[in-house]
């Protein structure tokens, strides 16, 4: 299904998925993507993705692909047809954020939308959750949730590794009272900058945050945990 002009959702079915465990919305799985090398010793191209929806009883898995470049994942997803197969591994481990905070703030770009969407949908009824997502125009999504969701969509006007628009949107946002959790995922330098701003300048407790670089300019298949 084409969720937005640049976001494609593909469904996978396998009996092996009945044993698939994904305890956290930002889990990572490895996709073993084919390459142009047809030799017997050719190795697949590995890429990290988020399990968007999992149905272990039905043996199905949904993965969202951000069609943002001509990389191997985009090429495979854009040309995938019913009956095509793909090897998937993981997730190897989960960092579970408790669903007992007073509020949540989720920040990211297109690459973070699968994890953001899943978390918004899985949060308990009534809990406030604000999302700040920067993307190309026309990439807004809607999520089915019983949480008190407040979406903030920021239209990108510059480079994808520019943190200024997200920071400006956050500067106008008053963090709610009580104990809250902030989650950030974007280009590595953006995620690091926003985490520093929210902790060092806004005073949010360091231990109640999680930040990651889901990609890094100039590097293929980059993923970086950001913290002390």
Language-model features, listed with the residues they occupy:
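Extended, composition-driven regions rather than compact fold-specific motifs
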Residues: 1-228
